[in-house]
């Protein structure tokens, strides 16, 4: 009863009857009245009177006369039995359509027409009809069903019995009328024709039309007109003509039944814990329940059901109950562990299929794979095999996954240049650069985050192919390919027999480096062909040609013996290294010995108190610049001392150079890979130097070499005019400079503020000094200079060259550098935290 009531409520829109609104008191009053014998007798008499045909005729005549007084002609249509069509509404509710006849309906008529598709001639039929309202009824098993009446002219039914095509057109017209009027979907694939002339009790219907020639009495307003609805307008007097269908709707051979998929879950308390794997299966149901509505089937013996891991297929070929359904499941199910049950009362098939869930190990492997892919593109260098310690068990034990014994895969087919790139993959040509070194070529492919395991190379004698892939932030791979081919033999002018011996490809963070090694006796080509593949290559030039450097000092040629002299003095140790003696150098050495034994002057003794070392390479380089090509020819037999320093010469004093374009520099540069100069190296042939004094400073207490040059006096380029004061000196204060920047101020603001404060202090010191104080300051300064020359434990060393000229006609103003003592220097600059140098000018006369 509940099922029938639910279906009746669902299809209440199929009729215009309103639901009875009865209260409980009214229902009790009706029940009490029916319980009385007198009331039941009166009620049955009323029913018999209403159903009496004679009384029905009197009722119809009175209604006709009443409508005629309003100017409306009405006709009562009494359906006569014809045949019945059985189908279903929306695949759920059983439905009967009575095809009846009545002479009150117009006759069908036809016209000769032409088929627009085939061009053949035929008849175009116009079939009038009348419909009654749908009503509820019961079938033979007392189940709820729906009944509709469609009334045609008796001639239409007569033609349907003689012509099958006309009968089919008549049935289609009736079905279209029901679907259009009541907005329902009828099952046309499962039409049945029961052996019935009419379903239920025939009920007449009324056809209303405006009177063609109303009488004056009929035109007068009736006193009861306000009780009836308004007259229809004159435009509605004509019957409604429906548009003719140019193409009939295709009738499906099988009907698609209604179905529903339900996901079934079990309450598992382990899913409500705080474990990491507690909610792995929250979104995966325990089973799937598929319900299929089959109202025309009596049992499952009349249909076929096939279930796979991902789909359900149902087929019923029974006449009047043709169903076909192919359903894809949202989850993988176990087709062997499912079950099906058919409810004969509801005509419903229920299929229960358990869902296949992945194991915990498979879930963890999947999450590890996703984590690996996400970390490969994060830009942070991590080990790919590292696992998060959070995923370990509390006891530190991780279950070992059983290793699957798999057979070794067969060897892949050999790659060829034509099959190296896949047709289904889109490749891009990366940006590249090429460098050559002897018999090797290096290609730099500018592609970042390349997967090392995706690099595949293919080598031939004269070509190389490489392909690789990268994975971006969206886990979408991007494929790259590069093809390089050596030029043909005709293009090579200097070497023709070189070929590629081996290749190496390595992936870095921002690029891929591919190295090509040619034959041992081969040379890198000047050009090459490159592109995405062998077709459409472009020629590129090799601009970076390099040659491997060979160490000439490691040659096995014996070095000639050198003259090494060591002289000890009170303040320093002088080591002199000379090449093999010649007639010229012997005389120069004698003069140097005489100058050394000669009593030095007062100023020279003051300078000699400082320890000096002479740079061998500086003198050799100056000799090379002075002698020129002639000097090099004369000393061809003399072995050259390996150059240990590189210097540039200043261009500021042009008078010392003369007409020759020789550069002089005040900066000294050292080779990054050559040996550092020692502090005791002496300069051979000092008098042969033809340039002015070099002031190249080297700190003996530091491994770093700095350059400080005071000034280069102008000297004659002759041997007599060579200066002896080529000093190289630098001094560093013991104080460490420290600069503190506050976070709430800018650097430029602090710099200006400190400079202003320093200037104010200097002006204040100058104002405090009187004339007498200035004299005391000079005496104190002279005393400090004398103490500086005395030997002490904290002695400053000089590591430069001191070259002076012997010419009496030229005077040079050499700016010799003198420094304050550490105590004086600290007193003068303790507040400024800076290093200051004081330069004293002295004139040297020889």
Swiss-Prot record:
Keyword Oxidoreductase attached: no
Disulfide bonds: none
GO BP term, pick one: cilium-dependent cell motility
Keyword entries, A-Z: Cytoplasm, Phosphoprotein
Composition bias, Low complexity: 399-408
Skewed-composition ranges (Basic and acidic residues): 821-832
InterPro entries: Kintoun (IPR034727), PIH1/Kintoun_subfamily (IPR050734), PIH1_N (IPR012981), PIH1D1/2/3_CS-like (IPR041442)
Record field: compositional bias (Basic residues): 596-612, 750-766
Cellular localisation: Cytoplasm
Modified residues (Phosphoserine): 378, 770
Region (Disordered): 1-21, 377-412, 581-657, 743-846
Annotated GO CC locations: cytoplasm
Keyword Phosphoprotein: yes
Record's subunit section: Interacts with Pp1alpha-96A, Pp1-87B, Pp1-13C and flw.
Family: Belongs to the PIH1 family. Kintoun subfamily.
Function: Required for cytoplasmic pre-assembly of axonemal dyneins, thereby playing a central role in motility in cilia and flagella. Involved in pre-assembly of dynein arm complexes in the cytoplasm before intraflagellar transport loads them for the ciliary compartment.
Entry protein name: Protein kintoun
UniProt organism field: Drosophila pseudoobscura pseudoobscura (Fruit fly)
Gene for this chain: Nop17l
